[in-house]
Amino acid sequence: ICYIYLNFFWGDEMKFQSTRGLEKGISSAEAIVRGIAKDGGLFVPESFPNLYSKLKEEKNLSYVDLAYKIISKYFTDIKAADLKEAIKDAYEGRFDVTVNNGFMELYHGPTCAFKEAALLFLPQVMKRAKKAIGVKEEVVILTATSGDTGKAALEGFKDVDGFKVVVYYPNNGVSPIQQRQMSTQEGNNVKVFAINGNFDNAQTGVKEIFGDEEFKKSLLSKGYILSSANSINIGRLVPQIVYYFYGYFKLVEQGKINQGDEINVVVPTGNFGNILASYYAKQMGLPINKFICASNDNKVLTDFFRTGTYDKKRELILTESPSMDILVSSNLERLLYEACNRDGKIVKDLMKSLNSNGEYKVSDDMKNFTNEFYGNFANQGEVYNAIKEKYKREGYLMDTHTAVAEVVYEKYVAETGDNRPVLIASTASPYKFPRSICKALDIDVEKLNDFEVIKELNKMTGIEIPENLKDLDKKQVKHKEVWDKDEMRKALLSYLK
C-alpha cells in the first residue's frame, strides 16, 4: 500500500490547504483559529509525516509525550514550549486512555466521552494559536452537537480568556443525561441553546452562519470573530490521531501483537472525524489493515462505501446511539479529497451536488480508493443483544455506540474471516445512556428517572459510576432557552449583545 504525501523533511513547516481548492499554504495557527476555509472547504495538512518508524523505537511513552511528538509535526508555527504546555494543560491528570480486551476506552475524562481527547486540547492550542497570529478579537466558538461534543466543548473552553462558547443542540434529540450535562454548565463565557429541529438542522445552521460574510463583518465590528469546535476544525482532528498510536503501542505492550503487525480498527461513526483520524494515523505509517466504519440505522455511510453514492435524502431516525444520528458526515469531505488525488474542484462539485440535490456519486477510481473501508450498520435489537451478551459472557459493559461497533465488527469477521487483532473505539461511558443499557440487560427501570436509573445500573452491575455523573441531578440548571431552527443567528446575537 502506498502511503500518500509522506513528508521526509523533519522540522519542516507544515502548511494547510482547503479541500475545495481555493486556499493553500495556510499556517496551522490560522487554520485552527479560522476553523473553516473561505470557500467552505475543510483544512487538511499538505503532507503526512511518516512517524511510526521513529515512534516504535521509543518504549512506553506517556500519552502526553506521545501527543507532543505527533501534534508538533502538524502545528509547527506554535512555539515548542507553548505547544508542550498546551498538551500538558489539556491532558495531565484530566484524560486517560485504557485498552481493555481490544476495546480502546476513550471516555476517562471530565465528560465521559471520547470527544474530550480533542476538546480539552483545542482551547489550549487555540489560545496559543491566537497569540501566534496576533488576533486581538474575542473568539466566539460555535458548536452544533448531537450530544457529546457540546459538553466537551463547554468543559474545555469554560473560563478560558479571550473566548466565548455557544452550543446548539436538538431539543429532545440528545439523552437526558447529555442534556443535563449541558444545561448545568458553569463558566462565565458559555451559552447553550436548544433548537427545535434535529442535529443536521443545527449543523447546517452553524455552517450557514460561518458562510454569511455580512453577518461576520457585523460581528467583527463588535470585536468578535467566529470559530468552530466541531470536528471540521483541524485543531480537533489532529489530536485524535494520537490515541490510535497509543492504542496500537498498548496492544504491543500487552503482547497481543508484535511491533509492525497490521491491525483492524473499528469506529462507531457519525461525523466521520474519529475514523478519519485513524486513516491519518495510517498515512503516518501506523500498520492498519481495514477501517471498519460502524453506523446505526442512519446508514448513509454504509450505503456510500457499498455503492459509491452518498444520499442524504432520507428521514433521520432517532436511535439509542444519538451521537451517531447524523445524515451529513462532514469529515468525509477530507477523505474524498485524498480519494480524488487532492483535486479541489472535484470535491467542490461533489459538495455542491450534496447541497442542491441531496446526493452525489463518486467516480469508479474514487470508489476503489475507499476499499480500505468496510461499512455496515447495527439496529436496536442487535445493539441490545450485543450489550447483554458481552456483559453476560465477560462482565464487560459497553455503551450503545460502542455496541454498534461491536455488532458491525462481528459482521465483518463473519463476512471476511479476517480475525486479526483489533482496536475497537469505545467512545462513551455506559452511564451516559443508562436507560438503554438497563433495557438491554432486562433491568426494569420504567418508573425511575434517568438519575435513579444510573444508581440502579450501578446496584445491579457493581460497575463504578464516573465521578462527574454522580450528582448531576443536584446541579443547578443554568441554560433553558429554546429557539426555532431558523433563529440561530438571532439566538447568538441575543447572547453577544
Q: Which residues does each PLM region occupy?
A:
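PLP-dependent amino-acid enzyme catalytic core
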Residues: 2-497
